[in-house]
Amino acid sequence: MGLVQMSSKELERYALIRRVVGKELGQSFAAAQLGLSVRQIKRLCAAYRAQGAQGLISKQRGRASNRQTKPNTRSRIMALVHTHYSDFGPTLACEYLQSQHGVTLSSETLRQWLIADGLWKPRVRRAKRAHPSRERRPCAGELIQIDGSPHAWFEDRAPNCTLIAFIDDATSKVMGARFYPTETTVAYLDVLERHVRQHGRPVSLYSDRHGVFTNHKESANTPTQFGRACLQLEIESILALSPQAKGRVERLFQTLQNRLVKALRLAGISDIESANRYLEETYIAAHNKRFGVEAHNPQDAHRAYAGTDVDLKRICALHHKRQYSSTLACQ
């Protein structure tokens, strides 16, 4: 008998089957050790008696898998990737291949192809500093995390701008998001007004300590313009002490800086007005379907706004105190 190459698994199987054939072990014991049925052990014993060790080697060795992708199929898919999705990650590229080209492929298969073509580098998993996860609020509308992200949202096609987003803590759904030239009080008040119109008044808003939300002047107890609007709308304003505390909105922007930037590019969008229309009509709904979760409690904690549209606009506008001089000039 010539030299037979075996894997470690096949060597273990060979050692046990040989002892079963030699009446040193029972078939039931061997079946339990190998995780096989007694019927399979009987087949292996018969193969060993007929062919020796060669009979225990897998018949699939050296044969291409029936599930292996055909070379011409791989070439066609990678041509699409190189043309449209060369800087996409495997998961996102798979989603676009499915939705835009009708190509169904596992992200792991595509990841291997991207690595082979030099389009993706395997990530080294680094130990992360532990930040205890805060439990989600049970109801939608109980806590809305808000923040703004200045970024090259249109890449090199237009100047940088800021995306302001409101995300629900209970569901991770984007409740509102809009682009603005810069991160300003007026921008936040605009998103707040839109949120109240569409969803109602949330119980609380969770933000960082940006000057829009807190007055940094010493001994200044007066609220900011945004804080005053929250007071008038009876919305609690909570200030986070660290970025990790409002992790959901931070992770949202990480996702959007990857996915939304590419979506805007593929849609040929390079201006704020078109981008806001795209967010409202297309992107937010698709994002929430992909990443949203169900709240633990199905009750919505948003409260209806009983005032008029004019009242809401007045609340969400900038307020300034003025006085009249003796000549009735407004100062």
Protein language model features and the residues they cover:
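C-terminal, beta-rich DNA-binding module of retroviral/retroelements integrases
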Residues: 284-331
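Short, basic alpha-helical/linker "hinge" immediately adjacent to a nucleic-acid-recognition surface
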Residues: 3, 7, 18, 27-82
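Mobile genetic element proteins and their domesticated derivatives, centered on retroelements
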Residues: 16, 30, 41-44, 52, ...
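RNase H-like two-metal-ion nuclease catalytic core shared by retroviral integrases
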Residues: 68, 205-208, 216-231, 235-259, ...
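Basic, flexible linker segments flanking DNA-binding modules
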Residues: 52-146, 151-152, 298-309
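Short, charged, surface-exposed loops that flank catalytic or proteolytic processing sites
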Residues: 147, 263-278
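Mobile-element integrase/transposase regions
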Residues: 72, 83, 103-104, 115-174, ...
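Residues that mark the N-terminal boundary/hinge immediately upstream of a DNA-recognition element
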Residues: 25-26, 89
